[in-house]
Amino acid sequence: MAVGKNKRLSKGKKGVKKRTVDPFTRKDEYSVKAPSTFQTRDVGKTLVNRTSGLKNANDSLKGRIFEVSLADLQNDEDHAFRKVKLRVDEIQGKNCLTNFHGLDFTTDKLRSLVRKWQSLIEANVTVKTTDDYLLRLFAIAFTKRRPNQIKKTTYARSSQIRAIRKKMTEIMQREAASCSLAQLTTKLIPEVIGREIEKATQGIYPLQNVHIRKVKLLKSPKFDLGALLNLHGESTTDDKGHKVEREFKEQVLESV
């Protein structure tokens, strides 16, 4: 008889499966709250592993970024082509308090704006708000036909494009540098800056579809809990903020 391993003794019991544990039993659900700048405060829910040992659930949640359609935040389908980024800065009970982290256009909207027979003009500016948030704003605009124009094309000359771009950067710099991040958000929702650029450039070349297509947050100031709580109002459980009307207009300077 050959000396070797007894295969029968080494085998385990047949039919015994490894016990699987559902990972969702170790998770907790938290509500994501948008700032009171937006009409709808209740963004949704997020999951996180329950606090155990040295791993704190709050630390895992802080810094999370959520991308939400502005149409959902404002209950208005006209804003469906814009996406807002919200960053979790503080946890209060089972609520994640967020702050504005950026704005962007959907790809299909941007592609639908670009057409033949017109000039596309883009500008960007890096600006610091009054509460020390460093932002980069990207604007986009397109030329349109003048009244009673017969010519098919609406191409602007290079000198006109440079003049329009200069106006765009000046207006973006002025509007963003003179207000806080929350005030700038109220200007971005009804597209106040885009309308102001359109008015200011009428004398150079008429424009259409003028938008702040993207807002990028480059640097945030030191975290201030009081400022964040003020941004969310006195009650952090309130699901509604104040509505920003589309008809909101600011006084335009005569010298522009």
Swiss-Prot record:
The modification N-acetylalanine is found at A2. GO terms for molecular function: structural constituent of ribosome. It is found in: Cytoplasm. One of its GO terms (biological process) is translation. SMART domains: Ribosomal_S3Ae. GO terms for cellular component: cytosolic small ribosomal subunit. Residues 1-18 have a biased composition (Basic residues). Residues 1-21 are annotated as: Disordered. Keywords: Acetylation, Cytoplasm, Ribonucleoprotein, Ribosomal protein. It comes from the Eukaryota. InterPro entries: Ribosomal_eS1, Ribosomal_eS1_CS, Ribosomal_eS1_euk. Pfam families: Ribosomal_S3Ae. Component of the small ribosomal subunit. Mature ribosomes consist of a small (40S) and a large (60S) subunit. The 40S subunit contains about 33 different proteins and 1 molecule of RNA (18S). The 60S subunit contains about 49 different proteins and 3 molecules of RNA (25S, 5.8S and 5S). Belongs to the eukaryotic ribosomal protein eS1 family. This is Small ribosomal subunit protein eS1.
